[in-house]
Amino acid sequence: MHPISPLEQALHAARALVLADLAAGEVAAADVVSMVEESVVQRRWWVEQWPEGVEYIAGLVAQDVQDALLEAYGRWPLCPVCGGGDPHALDVEPELGPDPHWVCHKAGVKVAAVGTLASAAGGSSSS
């Protein structure tokens, strides 16, 4: 058995983190999971071209899926911090950096690390 390369480890971790956030929002349907897989394929090529970017993969996959969902369904993930008013999506910060977090720019707060949205939402789903 061959050891798993750092690239494959990072891609698997990014996939798992984004899928965890999708599951937390109860939006991990088959077509959405396909969006994750498409992003992973594209980011594999990207990081093969720029190996130093391997630590940025999780945030980039999260952003890719967020963009794909916006085009297909609407904003995701919705902010669990701000109560009433106009629902708005969280953003990933840093846009290109390690340790990505979901942030609410409206409230000016970090909401959760990518992969941990379930804890930020208190484990409950919103309707």
For each of these PLM feature ranges, what is it?
Residues 51-127:
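Cys/His-clustered metal-coordination modules, chiefly Zn-binding fingers
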Residues 1-55:
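N-terminal alpha-helical interaction blocks
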